[in-house]
């Protein structure tokens, strides 16, 4: 009987172990994503004149606008405040996602 090829010391037992480890990591990542989706993240502009609340899956859940931020003569100011609050909320979600998921992707890039 011929000799089996050597794949750098990676026998079938090692391959099965790697597959098992990858499945476990996938389950952990899915649990982290589900946990993030249940959390809320807030972006605020101009001393809470506009507050945007996002879920962890980046969906806008609430947008509060203080009546003092509404100036009929300056709609651009309100637009800028909304954009600022929304961008800050999205950044909060992204930062939390990176902190949570980064441990799984470190070294893969």
UniProtKB/Swiss-Prot annotation:
GO terms for molecular function: DNA binding. Keywords: Cytoplasm, DNA-binding. Coiled coil: none annotated. SUPFAM superfamilies: YbaB-like. It is found in: Cytoplasm, Nucleoid. InterPro entries: YbaB-like_sf (IPR036894), YbaB/EbfC (IPR004401). Binds to DNA and alters its conformation. May be involved in regulation of gene expression, nucleoid organization and DNA protection. This is Nucleoid-associated protein LJ_0424. The lineage of its organism: Bacteria, Bacillati, Bacillota, Bacilli, Lactobacillales.
